[in-house]
Amino acid sequence: MSTNLSNAEILNNLLEGRDLDELTSRALMQRWLNDEISDVETGAFLSALRAKSSTGVELSSMAKELLNVCELPVARPNLYLVDTCGTGGDGANTFNISTAVAFVAASCGVKIAKHGNKSASGKVGSADVLLNLGLNLNCSLEKVINAVSEIGITFLFAPVWHKSLIKLAPLRKTLGIRTVFNQLGPLVNPLRPNAQVLGVASEDLLQPMGSALLNLGMNRAIVVHGSGGLDEASLQGKNKLVFIENGELRFSEINISDFNHENIANENLVVSDLDSNEEILKSVLNGSGQKSHMDVVALNVSLVLWAAGIEDNLNEGFNKALFSINKGDPWKKFLLLKNYLSAN
């Protein structure tokens, strides 16, 4: 994959607001991976892409290059896999909803391959809270992959699988802005899931992320931007959705009031630190949590059940999720995964 354009020419196109085609987007990512772009150029590229806004073609093309260099140590399980990884970065400091969603969905029969990382901009990322709960993220990659067949859920810690991007981390941190790599994270799950629910922190990302998932061959997916700016479906009001199905994008909205529940402000979902995040996550999974916490998780699980093809009716999916939560099945699923990853 190559292009005759120099780094300077590609950068100039971006600065003039021109979108990159697939060939150029893939070539740009290859140059990053091959250390053919300096730190100064990287800062300029990331800033220019941010200012222009990345397209679905740019995102999916770069994601393909990242996936091409991500080799699996064992064969991918022949299962219909679903991911709940989003962009993060909404700055709302809510408890880690997508992680709770993953375990609840798994307890409802969805095969979950959860891709995640440490915090993007909030206080706690999925890896942070799972590490605090004692999940072993340093076991063999073979065991990580096999867990989805044995337990029905696994967690893929992004830095372990995408080591080529570690060298960019200090520069991204120095820039202090959200970049295209925040958007690429949810698109580069090494197990290449068949379906996904992908939360975005900005409404402007709904269409490009939906198009990217479509370009990557996703069977079914939902991109969601929550009321009040969450990168999850929110209890606060109208949530914007893009459904990906049959090769098409369909825009829609849902409100918790559609499920005969009252709207609740996002402030009720805020946590102050890692320990309180852990406490809330555990209480949701074992069925002893606050109603608002369990409801917001169930709402998002209903989207996962749709993506998995288990329940097309979101209201029914919501009730199915609450039933599983109230039985404490998600916590049992977490303990099974914890024990499996810790065993010799």
UniProtKB/Swiss-Prot annotation:
Residues reported to bind 5-phospho-alpha-D-ribose 1-diphosphate: 86, 89-90, 94, 96-99, 114-122, 126
Cysteine disulfide partners in this protein: none
Chain sites annotated for binding anthranilate 2: R172
Gene Ontology terms: biological process: L-tryptophan biosynthetic process
GO CC terms, sorted: cytosol
The protein's enzyme class: transferase
Family annotation (Pfam families): Glycos_trans_3N, Glycos_transf_3
EC nos: 2.4.2.18
Binding residues for anthranilate 1: G86, N117
Catalytic reaction list: N-(5-phospho-beta-D-ribosyl)anthranilate + diphosphate = 5-phospho-alpha-D-ribose 1-diphosphate + anthranilate
Keyword Iron: no
Keywords of this entry: Amino-acid biosynthesis, Aromatic amino acid biosynthesis, Glycosyltransferase, Magnesium, Metal-binding, Transferase, Tryptophan biosynthesis
SUPFAM superfamilies reported in the protein's UniProt record: Nucleoside phosphorylase/phosphoribosyltransferase catalytic domain (SSF52418), Nucleoside phosphorylase/phosphoribosyltransferase N-terminal domain (SSF47648)
Pathway(s) annotated for this protein in UniProt: Amino-acid biosynthesis; L-tryptophan biosynthesis; L-tryptophan from chorismate: step 2/5
Amino-acid biosynthesis as UniProt keyword: yes
Quaternary structure (record): Homodimer.
Summary of the function given for this chain in its UniProt record: Catalyzes the transfer of the phosphoribosyl group of 5-phosphorylribose-1-pyrophosphate (PRPP) to anthranilate to yield N-(5'-phosphoribosyl)-anthranilate (PRA).
Alphabetized HAMAP family for the sequence: TrpD
Protein family per UniProt: Belongs to the anthranilate phosphoribosyltransferase family.
Protein name: Anthranilate phosphoribosyltransferase
Gene label: trpD
